[in-house]
Amino acid sequence: MTDCTQQKTIQLSFPVTYWTDYFTAMLLLPYGRYRACRYFRQPFVQDFPFLSSVLRLSCKYFICIPRRQCLERLQSYFPTTLAEWDRRERMSLAPDGHYDPRHEIPSPIHVINLARELNVGSILPAAFYDLARYGTSKTAGGTEPLPRLVLEVPSSEDSPASASTSTSTSTSTSTFAPTFVPSSWTASSSEATCGASRFTSPMLVQDTTPVRLSHDDLVLTFRGRETMQRSVSAFLSSQVKDRPPSAGCTVPGAGQACRDAFYFITLNTLRAVGGIAAGRDGDPLFTLGQMIDMLHHTEWVDGQYLRGLPMCGKCRDEFIPAVHAGRQAIWDQIPAWFALEPYDILKARDDELNERDMYP
C-alpha cells in the first residue's frame, strides 16, 4: 500500500506489515470512514484531534470520502466567503454576548500547521486572519498541544504524559475522550499504574510543550496584522471622517448634524480600534460592523438626555451600503495580505482534489 511498509515473516510464517504510522491514528481511520457524520456533530474543538488524524491518513492513503468530509468540516469554520465567516462569528458568541471562539474552534495555529502539512490552501486565509487578530506576544508564544490518544502508559512516572494519566486517568477519559472510543476501553486505576511493558486502555494525554508556527508563517502573520490595522484607518479616512452629507439630506444647516454623526462614529471607532473593548483585538471586519451598530445606539448624550445619532435617513441609507462594501473589500484582500493565492484558486484546487480518487 505504501513504500513506507515492509513485509517480514515471523516464526509461524504469517506475513506481518510494519507501519510507520501510530497505531492510535490507524485506530481512528475506520471510524472516520464509516461514522464521521455522527461524530462531527460534536463541537469542532473536541473533534479536531480526531479530524486531523483521519485527514492525514486519508490524504496519505488516498481515501477520498473521509478526506472530503474532513475538508468540508474545516471549511465550515475557516470559510472562503464573508457570509460564512459572519455565521461562524455569531456561533462563537456565548448567550451573554461574550466572544469566546476557542470554546468552539481550535487554535488557528493548529489549523495553519495542518493546512501547510497537507497542502489544504482554502482554509489558510481565514485561519491567518483569525490568528492575526491577537496580540503579537500571544501569537509568538504558541498554543497548547492537542491531546493525543495513547495505548501504553509511559514508564517514566515524572513525564508529563505519565503524570496526566496516573493522577487523573478517569477524569481525562471522561472529559477529553471522543465518543467513538468504546466504553469497554475505559481504563481502570490498576491498569493505569502498570509498567510500560503492559498495554492499557486508550486514553488522551496532554503534552506541555507549546505548538508554534514556523518562522515564515509567523512573519506572514505579523505583516498581515499590520496591514489589517491600516485597512481600518484607510476606511475611516475615505468613507467616514470627511464624508459629505447625502445629496438628499433632510437636515437643515447644510447637513451639519449628519457631519457631526460621522465625526462621532470616527471618534468612537478610534477609541476602541479592533474591538479592544469587546475582547476582539485587531479585527477590522468587526470594527466596521460596529459602525453600523452605532447607528442604532441610543446612549449618545445630548445635555442630560440619551439620544441616537443625529443622522437623517438619507445619509444613513447611503452609509450602510458603504460599510458593507468596505467589509467585503477587506475580506477579498485577506489572501494577498498573507501572501496567498485568491480564494477561488485555493478553493478550486481543494475541490478538485476532493473529486479525485487519489492525489496526483
Residues covered by each model-derived region:
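Short, recurring structural edge motifs at helix starts
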Residues: 7-11, 38-44, 52-55, 59, ...
